[in-house]
Amino acid sequence: MEESSMESDNGLNLRNDVKNLVEQETYKWIFVGGKGGVGKTTISCSLSSILSERRESVLLLSTDPAHSLSDAFNQKFTDTPTLVNGYENLYAMELDVTRVADTGFGLNETKMFLQTIPELFQMLPGIDEALSFSELLQSVQSMKYSVIVFDTAPTGHTLKFLNLPDTLDKLLESFLKVESLCGVAMKLFSALNNSLPKEEIFQKLKRFKSNLTLIMNQMKDPNRTTFVCVCIPEFLSVYETERLIQSLAKTDIDCSYIIVNQVLSYINLEEHVKNTQNSLENLSPENKKVLDCFFELVLEQQNNLNGRLSIQRKYIEDIKQLYEGFFNIVAIKQYKYEVRGSEAIKEFSKALLKHSPIPDS
């Protein structure tokens, strides 16, 4: 058995790297999600980079309104798939799901539908985003890429997406209730506002829901779709990761990878400082005073770092207790440099393929 592979009590073959993930050729959609600021985009880019070496064609699609793909690759991306510099088969695009009907991506059905239904239904919470995302995934489904990696919006947006079937059910229910309570007024309202007839509105909503059901069937197929959770060892991130994992489990969407990013390493410089001070005993009092001040600052920074590390270790222990033995957990150390540009991403991606267990607390 390889060093990075272990069999859990429940028979799962778990690893502390992403080799199984990137080598499973049946995957069509890989979603990467988590709290904002935990490094989702860097992980998404790195996974896409690795996949481009194994698959015929890869699309990296950002649905995060903040859009960091352009920053990560040092290259401007739009709502049209664009070849990433330094690659032959990796494409990237950025879409704002909350405004996707206004983009040039071709989601005209949602835009036209929202323009023709009564304003009463346009005000229903989540209708624009729900319908836009439904049509977006329909369009993505027809794209001819071997695999698509989704750099998703922060957890709250992702949870809203997972609740889309329920949202559309509620929209249909609301439509029927309002229509039954004030059918005559609805007809007059539609006539005055050039809205679609109620029967056509109802049928379109049903079609959106039917299409979304087909999409969710692919989402729930563990051979075609999986979700990668990214977190850092801090309270809010671990909390949101648990929320996301629970929601994925509730909707029967596969999630077997957790990447713990920005993990700090313990340092101890006290012995080095002491030895250096002893070797400099012949210095003048003035110079020795200056160096003592410097060493004091060094030890202060060490204590600050190790204090933060102690906090991280608490949440690393929580991660181990919650997920060890059930998930592939990969720990990525705090990177020394900013990860920007294709070469930096290729270098960073090597860490995902190495045996990287979470450290002992």
From Swiss-Prot:
Belongs to the arsA ATPase family. It comes from Theileria parva. Its EC number is 3.6.-.-. The active site is at 64. The keyword Cytoplasm applies. Homodimer. GO terms for molecular function: ATP binding; ATP hydrolysis activity. ATPase required for the post-translational delivery of tail-anchored (TA) proteins to the endoplasmic reticulum. Recognizes and selectively binds the transmembrane domain of TA proteins in the cytosol. This complex then targets to the endoplasmic reticulum by membrane-bound receptors, where the tail-anchored protein is released for insertion. This process is regulated by ATP binding and hydrolysis. ATP binding drives the homodimer towards the closed dimer state, facilitating recognition of newly synthesized TA membrane proteins. ATP hydrolysis is required for insertion. This is ATPase ASNA1 homolog. ATP binds at residues 35-42, 234, 261. It is found in: Cytoplasm; Endoplasmic reticulum. Its main location: cytoplasm. One of its GO terms (biological process) is tail-anchored membrane protein insertion into ER membrane. GO terms for cellular component: GET complex.
